[in-house]
């Protein structure tokens, strides 16, 4: 991994002699800059415009070279608002790509696309920085062994297991528990894998970014008293940012994650919320640069841009980056080029269901809609695969019977179907579990359930050994032993009432 030891502040690396150009044209966030003969900057070089506007306010805008136009002219894209810029202003070529701070100094802090802290907690150590543009790891560096990334969340580990170094799509509307699930995963990777997380907020609402930060502080994922003990670094490029910032903020977050993987040799979780906004920003940039649009108005380079981001997210012999990406599906059209291109890269999907959330079953992961390419006997083993398939079959049969139950009632079902329904309801409740990060809201301590414990629990329910226990005993518990203990307590309570 290439690291630049610099003391130059954020966004850029210093070079000895300044290469100066001047703004020739300015259209929104796009600048045309003229440089002296033979001093043209390279593609993706960072340019800095410094000066004062008409009301004597300080201007400091960083841009990225996108096109070399000829006649000593380059076209660059601004990473922040271009208010106050005028033709003829001086532009400095930094001689290098955008570079951002990396390492332990980033934990517990919020950054913008340039790696500048935006949380009013003072400066960040910038002695170790890294450029945001890198090629994906060489094939020889990759760890090709297929292994499961245990999350400690029963429904995920059993029915839609995550691949170590894989990409997972997270689908769900507002208010079904996406944020809590994300925070629990951040908490669990830190405790069980000694890993860290990087959260990339790409083109979403500023309010949501602020809410996430506040919730992370409340749940202890970000340690206010000792920032260095925090488990996550946050990088935000929100809806109000120019398209250049929204297009590059994903790369900034990924660069920070790569350092933890390659240098610290850790397992890293990289969250991208929302991957659709990355594509959307690329589409805006493409139009601004005058490229011919492709299908549905998207950029012609859609697959290339997506690939250059996704191929860097992988397992190497040093460590792994496992990525969880929230996917917005425009107009619920799964054939739209943006989600369709994203699906090609995903190893698993976690679908959150409003119906389950309404029943109070959290995490509200839909066990039938969520999928994973890892759920194969040769990868997870026969026992895990068989248990998962039987759980799905039981839940599917229950789903088919629900219309009959609603119209005719349970009594009209056959004995076998009644047993299936009873077991399915136990399974449904056993798929819920108390989260560590939700302790402050629920009052019940969080539970991390290992994969072997999860499989054992569901096998006992399916075998019929626990048919005599009430279904509420399975609700919001950790392993199956807690469910049996809860059933005994419920029985004692009911006997006392009598």
From Swiss-Prot:
Keyword Isomerase among record annotations: no
Catalytic activity entry: ATP + H2O + 4 H(+)(in) = ADP + phosphate + 5 H(+)(out)
Highest taxon of source: Eukaryota
Keywords: ATP synthesis, ATP-binding, CF(1), Chloroplast, Hydrogen ion transport, Ion transport, Membrane, Nucleotide-binding, Plastid, Thylakoid, Translocase, Transport
A GO term for molecular function: ATP binding
Pfam families: ATP-synt_ab, ATP-synt_ab_N, ATP-synt_VA_C
Protein residues bound to ATP: 172-179
InterPro entries in UniProt: AAA+_ATPase, ATP-synt_VA_C, ATP_synth_F1_bsu, ATPase_a/bsu_AS, ATPase_alpha/beta_chains, ATPase_F1/V1/A1_a/bsu_N, ATPase_F1/V1/A1_a/bsu_N_sf, ATPase_F1/V1/A1_a/bsu_nucl-bd
Leader sequence segment: none
Coiled coil location: none
Subcellular location: Plastid, Chloroplast thylakoid membrane
Membrane topology: Peripheral membrane protein
Biological process according to GO: proton motive force-driven mitochondrial ATP synthesis
Entry EC no(s): 7.1.2.2
A single Gene Ontology CC term: mitochondrion
Family of this protein: Belongs to the ATPase alpha/beta chains family.
Assembly and binders: F-type ATPases have 2 components, CF(1) - the catalytic core - and CF(0) - the membrane proton channel. CF(1) has five subunits: alpha(3), beta(3), gamma(1), delta(1), epsilon(1). CF(0) has four main subunits: a(1), b(1), b'(1) and c(9-12).
Protein purpose: Produces ATP from ADP in the presence of a proton gradient across the membrane. The catalytic sites are hosted primarily by the beta subunits.
PANTHER family xrefs: ATP SYNTHASE (PTHR15184), ATP SYNTHASE SUBUNIT BETA, MITOCHONDRIAL (PTHR15184:SF71)
Name assigned to this protein: ATP synthase subunit beta, chloroplastic
Highest classification ranks of the organism: Eukaryota, Viridiplantae, Streptophyta, Embryophyta, Tracheophyta
């Amino acid at each position: 991994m290439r690291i630049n030891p610099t003391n130059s502040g954020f966004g850029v690396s210093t070079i000895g002699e300044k290469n100066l150009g001047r703004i020739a044209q300015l259209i929104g966030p796009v600048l045309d800059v003229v440089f002296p003969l033979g001093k043209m900057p390279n593609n993706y070089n960072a340019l800095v415009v410094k000066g004062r506007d008409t009301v004597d306010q300080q201007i400091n805008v960083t841009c990225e070279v996108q096109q070399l136009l000829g006649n000593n002219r380059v076209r660059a894209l601004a990473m922040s608002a271009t208010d106050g810029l005028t033709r003829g202003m001086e532009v400095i070529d930094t001689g290098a790509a955008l570079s951002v701070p990396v390492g332990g100094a980033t934990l517990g802090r919020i950054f913008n696309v340039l790696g500048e802290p935006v949380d009013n907690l003072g400066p960040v150590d910038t002695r170790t920085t890294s450029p945001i543009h890198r090629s994906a790891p060489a094939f020889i560096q990759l760890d090709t062994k297929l292994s499961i990334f245990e999350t400690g969340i029963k429904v995920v580990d059993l029915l839609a297991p995550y691949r170590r170094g894989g990409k997972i799509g997270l689908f769900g509307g507002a208010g079904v528990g996406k944020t809590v699930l994300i925070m629990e995963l951040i908490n669990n990777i830190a405790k069980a894998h000694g890993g860290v997380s990087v959260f990339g907020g790409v083109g979403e609402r500023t309010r949501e970014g602020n809410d996430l930060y506040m919730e992370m502080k409340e749940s202890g994922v970000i340690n206010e008293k000792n920032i260095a003990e925090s488990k996550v670094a946050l990088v935000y490029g929100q809806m109000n940012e120019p398209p250049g910032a929204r297009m590059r903020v994903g790369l900034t977050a990924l660069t920070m994650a790569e350092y933890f993987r390659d240098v610290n040799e850790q397992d890293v979780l990289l969250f991208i919320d929302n991957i659709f906004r990355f594509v959307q920003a690329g589409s805006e940039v493409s139009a601004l640069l005058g490229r011919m649009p492709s299908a549905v108005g998207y950029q012609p380079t859609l697959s290339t841009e997506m690939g250059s981001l996704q191929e860097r997210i992988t397992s190497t012999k040093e460590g792994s980056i496992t990525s969880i990406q929230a996917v917005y599906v425009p107009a619920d059209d799964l054939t739209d080029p943006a989600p369709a291109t994203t699906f090609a890269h995903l190893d698993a999907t976690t679908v959150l269901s409003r119906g389950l959330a309404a029943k109070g079953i959290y995490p509200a992961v839909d066990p039938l809609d969520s999928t994973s390419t890892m759920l194969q006997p040769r990868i997870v083993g026969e026992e895990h695969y068989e248990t998962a398939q039987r759980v799905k079959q039981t839940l599917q049969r229950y789903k088919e019977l629900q219309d009959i139950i609603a119209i005719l009632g349970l009594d009209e079902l056959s004995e076998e179907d009644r047993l299936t329904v009873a077991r399915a309801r136990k399974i449904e409740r056993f798929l819920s579990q108390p989260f560590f990060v939700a302790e402050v809201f629920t009052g019940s301590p969080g539970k991390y359930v290992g994969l072997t414990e999860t499989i054992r629990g569901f096998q006992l329910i399916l075998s019929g050994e626990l048919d005599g226990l009430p279904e509420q005993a399975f609700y919001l518990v950790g392993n199956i032993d807690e469910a049996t203990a809860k059933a005994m307590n419920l029985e004692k309570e009911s006997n006392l009432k009598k």
